[in-house]
């Protein structure tokens, strides 16, 4: 059996070998490996989120938004002192578009102020504001009241802004500066009522036109009336035009016309006169990174009398220093209308004539800043006046009113300085001082009614987003005044401190308080006109 298998194997080998010898060996040999194993990536486990709710968080999130601090240079303008020591207007209303502010004080003085805004501020904007205030002092007829309303509007086109204003001002003062032990006047006898309506319209370009010209002309009309005594109408037209001649040079021309018509009422002598000022102010301007110079002469006409006034001023920037040197020699004509002078002294009697003031100012000063928050300026001026109005008591009658005595020629060596520390809109501390050294008078013994020295300090602090605190302090040396028989004296110095605060209760309501004349210093700005003592007012503001 085994032999058979062996023989069969030999025969198979002999048969298969020739066949295998015929196989093509020129091709590559390939070995196929077949496997049932298949590699796969392992599935990762998913994160399982908790079904519990997050806890509520009602805290207010304040996103960081840093605004660079601004260095502001404040300009202080003289204001008249009313029987109330300080102006009751509050800076705390800034940023509120529509509000009603009401209050009451210890001097039987109601206070109300309202402000409304309309328009989107892009195509048009209209602002309507009104305020009323009155007070009653301890002296007979030491009363005061004022109602003011203003309508301001602007229309914005692609290249111009058309603006206008309509204002109403009703003000009651009283001549209470007489000897009350001798004279007994009724309230109507000493009433000094001013009624004023003022309108203004103008246009100014928003972008420089193809000719490279900037312009901003306006027309102002004022109707002023002193109850049963006088009326005065004024017309003012100003056209400033500026054209650029490149990056360094430009020219500017300003045309000014100021016309007043004055007439008395219910007086023994019928008084009527016109007062006209016409002034041309051409300027050639040179401006580069370090130097700015304005140069020119100003032909002017004062009631037909020709005057040529200087108009040269400029500033130099000190390289690599935060310092600017200012210099100049300028001149101007100042309209001494009854309205303008009564803003300074409301106890004037009617005019019999009117003279405008010619002013020439030779000055030098510096303006600078230190760090990011402090700015300051200093200015020395040598002023020369012609026909400067001085205020003297009417000693011929009852000494309760004032006359105008024009000084034909007077010099003033003036020094001004101011400094401010400002941190954005959160904190502001400003101080200013003015010294006047009048000399070389020709017609008057002293500069009656002028203040030799004045210091003003103002403080504003937004402690939180709901609480704001403010404070104002003023000190001045008394003005010289004239008594009977040419006896001259000076008013005692005056100091006035006021404080105020406002607290926002919610988005709609705020509470405010003002305390004026904290020292209870019953000083005088004008002889025989003592101001109120301490005055406390408080109330609420409704915002909507």
Task: Specify the residue positions occupied by each region the protein language model found.
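Exposed, low-structure sequence patches enriched in small/polar residues
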Residues: 95, 100-103, 131, 290-292, ...
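N-terminal periplasmic/intermembrane-space "pro-region" immediately following the signal or transit peptide
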Residues: 21-90
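Flexible loop and strand-edge segments within Gram-negative outer membrane beta-barrel domains
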Residues: 135-142, 148-150, 163-214, 220-234
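Short loop/turn motifs that connect adjacent beta-strands in outer-membrane beta-barrel proteins
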Residues: 88-95, 120-123, 156-161, 207-215, ...
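Bacterial Sec-dependent N-terminal signal peptides
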Residues: 1-25, 249, 323, 459, ...
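Outer-membrane beta-barrel transmembrane domain signature of Gram-negative proteins
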Residues: 189-202, 218-289
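Surface-exposed extracellular loop regions of Gram-negative outer-membrane beta-barrel proteins
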Residues: 117-135, 250-260, 265, 269-300, ...
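Outer-membrane beta-barrel translocator/receptor signature
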Residues: 80-85, 90-149
